[in-house]
A protein has these predicted regions:
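Aromatic "clamp/platform" in nucleotide-sugar-dependent glycosyltransferases that forms part
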Residues: 252, 271
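Short His-centered aromatic/hydrophobic patch
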Residues: 96-102, 120
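A conserved mid-protein helix/loop that constitutes part of the nucleotide-sugar donor-binding site
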Residues: 19-24, 191, 195-214, 229-235, ...
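Short hydrophobic beta-strand element within catalytic cores of glycosyltransferases
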Residues: 288-292
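Conserved acidic donor-binding segment of nucleotide-sugar-dependent glycosyltransferases
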Residues: 303-305, 309-316, 325-330, 345
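A short, well-ordered alpha-helix in the C-terminal region of glycosyltransferases
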Residues: 318, 325, 332-346, 358
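Carbohydrate-associated surface elements
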Residues: 153, 173
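N-terminal strand-loop element at the rim of the active site
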Residues: 8-16, 20, 24, 28-70, ...
Length: 364
C-alpha cells in the first residue's frame, strides 16, 4: 500500500525551538509516511535529518521589503511555489509552523484542495504583529483544519478568534538528544545551582545573581549555560556584588546533559516565554526547580509545591526565601526530584508524536 505523503513547512531549518520540533517530528514520522520539508528560504539544516526526508525550498533568500505591494507580490510567489511542490510531490497534508509560513501554507493547501494543520509557537503577549498581518492571520486561520499551540494560555488567546474544537494543545517534546541521558550517579560533591538559557532581555538572570548574593551560599556555586547580548552586564554584576568566584559563565554547551546531571537546583527567572524548553529539560533530569510563573509555560509544567516552586515574576524576596528553603531541605529536594521526573513522562518524543498522529490520521 502506498504511503501517505506529508509536507512540513517552516521559514528555515536553522537553530531554534520550532525548527528542532519539526525535525524531530519528521524524523519519527518518516517510518510510516513519506515526508517532505519545505523551507521558505534555503538553509543548511542545523539538526540532523533522516536522509529519507526530502528537503525543498521556496527561494535562496528573502528580502525584508518595506513596500506593501512588494511584500504581497512575494507572498503570492511563495504560495504559487508551495502549490507547485504540493502537486509535484502529491502531498496529502501540510503541517506548518510559525505565522508567515502558516498563512502561505493555508492558502496553498486550499488551492490544492488538501487539509492543513498550522502551529503557533510565539507568546502573543510579547510578540505583537503589525495590524494588517494580524488581520490576515486571523482570516487565514479560519481555513486551517487544526491550530496547534503549546500551552493552555495560548489556546485561550486563540479561542477568542477560532472555535475551541479546532485548537489543540500539544507541547514541545524533550529533545531527543537528551533522551536516556539522565544519570543521577554523576551528581558531584559540589552544590550547583543551574540556569540554562540565552542572555537577553526578558530572561532576567540578574534576579538569580542578586538573590544568590543575599543568602547563605558558602557551599554553593551558580552555573549559567548560554550566551547572548546581556551576558557581560551579568558578569559585571557578579563583580559589583563581589561574588564572581561563586558564579560560573560557561557559554553555550553541546553536552548540556552534563550540567543537568550535576546540578542540585535549577532556577528559571524568565519574565516571559513561548514554551520553556530549558525548564522542561531540568524537570526531566529530576532537578529540584524554582521558576517564575511567567506567561507562558511554567504553570503548565510545574505544580507548585509538588514538583517545584512557582514564584511571582521579578520577586527577589520570594526567590531568596524559596532558594534558602530548598537548599537546606534534602527531603523536599528528593520529593521535587522524584515528582519532576514523573511529570515529564508525557513529554517524551514518542508520546508527542502520538498526539500529532491522532489528528493526522483523521485527515489523511
Amino acid at each position: 500500500m502506498e504511503r501517505k505523503k506529508i509536507a512540513f513547512v517552516i521559514y528555515s531549518l536553522e537553530s531554534g525551538g520550532a525548527e528542532r520540533v519539526i525535525t524531530e517530528l519528521a524524523n519519527n514520522l518518516i517510518f510510516d509516511y513519506d515526508i517532505t520539508i519545505i523551507t521558505l528560504v534555503k538553509t543548511v539544516p542545523f539538526y540532523e535529518l533522516n536522509p529519507r526526508i526530502k528537503l525543498l525550498f521556496c527561494s535562496e533568500t528573502i528580502k525584508n521589503d518595506t513596500t506593501l505591494i512588494k511584500s504581497l507580490s512575494d507572498g503570492f510567489k511563495r504560495i504559487k511555489t508551495l502549490v507547485r511542490y504540493i502537486k509535484e510531490n502529491r502531498i496529502q497534508l501540510v503541517i506548518s509552523f510559525m505565522t508567515s509560513s502558516n498563512i502561505y501554507s493555508i492558502w496553498a493547501s486550499k488551492l490544492s484542495r488538501i487539509p492543513c494543520i498550522v502551529s503557533e509557537r510565539a507568546n502573543h503577549d510579547i510578540y505583537k504583529l503589525p495590524k494588517l498581518l494580524e488581520v490576515i492571520r486571523d482570516v487565514s486561520y479560519k481555513f486551517c483544519k487544526y491550530l496547534v499551540v503549546q500551552t493552555e494560555a495560548n489556546k485561550a488567546f486563540y479561542s477568542k478568534k477560532l472555535s475551541s474544537s479546532k485548537i489543540l494543545v500539544i507541547p514541545n517534546p524533550i529533545a531527543e538528544s537528551l533522551s536516556n541521558k539522565r544519570n543521577h550517579e554523576l551528581k558531584t560533591s559540589k552544590n550547583i545551582i543551574l540556569n540554562v538559557g540565552s542572555f537577553k532581555k526578558g530572561k532576567a538572570q540578574d534576579l538569580l545573581i542578586r538573590a544568590f548574593s543575599e543568602i547563605e551560599n558558602k557551599d554553593w556555586l551558580v552555573f549559567f549555560v548560554g550566551d547572548g547580548p546581556t551576558k557581560q552586564e551579568n558578569i559585571n554584576l557578579t563583580k559589583k556584588l563581589k561574588i564572581e568566584k561563586k558564579i560560573k559563565f560557561v557559554g553555550k554547551q553541546q553536552d548540556i546533559e552534563k550540567y543537568y546531571n550535576e546540578a542540585r537546583l535549577f532556577i528559571f527567572t524568565s519574565e516571559h516565554e513561548g514554551f520553556p524548553n530549558a525548564l522542561l529539560e531540568a524537570l526531566y533530569f529530576g532537578i529540584p526547580t524554582i521558576s517564575t510563573n511567567c506567561k507562558h509555560g511554567p504553570a503548565d509544567l510545574i505544580r507548585d509545591k509538588e514538583n517545584g516552586f512557582l514564584i511571582p515574576v521579578g520577586n527577589q524576596n520570594v526567590l531568596q526565601k524559596k532558594m534558602s528553603q530548598l537548599m537546606n531541605d534534602i527531603v523536599l529536594q528528593n520529593k521535587f526530584s522524584e515528582n519532576a521526573m514523573k511529570s515529564t513522562a508525557k513529554y517524551k518524543i514518542t508520546s508527542i508524536v502520538k498526539l500529532w498522529e491522532n489528528y493526522i490520521t483523521k485527515l489523511i
